[in-house]
Amino acid sequence: MLTETDERHLRRAIALAGTARAAGDGPFGSLLVAADGRVLAEEVNTERTDDDITAHPELKLARWAARRLAADEAGRATMYTSCQPCGMCATAIERSGLGRVVYALSTEQLAGLRPADAAPPVAYAGPALFDEARAAVEPS
């Protein structure tokens, strides 16, 4: 269940998405909010502007948090975002230690609204060469 505060911040994320869209970028916006309600940072999608397919607002905020927030502060922070984070962004969010994400549109809802933006399927093969791979990653 979302609080009124959650809804207010989520509306800001949606407004940021509109800003990105108006600039010709993907319609995605996000903000990071501290446990005390302070807005720590805001970002918009800049994939076209920066000619960078990884210029997602969620990824930029996860990087920001990893560099600037103590682990306990990150764990109490909330990211508000206009759409459910993609796999790349979700991994960065988890690795940054952020404790909570609130999003407006789900991945499925977004795909229904913007089918042309769906990523093409990729063929993955693996796991393979377990012993060799294990030797590369196992602690000495």
Model region roles, listed by residue range:
Residues 71-83:
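Immediate flanking context of iron-sulfur cluster ligation sites
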Residues 1-20, 85, 91-140:
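Zinc-dependent deaminase
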Residues 49-59, 64:
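A short, polar/charged loop-to-alpha-helix boundary motif
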Residues 28-37:
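Short beta-strand scaffold segments in enzyme catalytic cores
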Residues 44-45:
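Residue-level structural signal for beta-strand termini and adjacent loop
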Residues 24-28, 75:
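Short, basic and Ser/Thr-rich N-terminal targeting/leader segments
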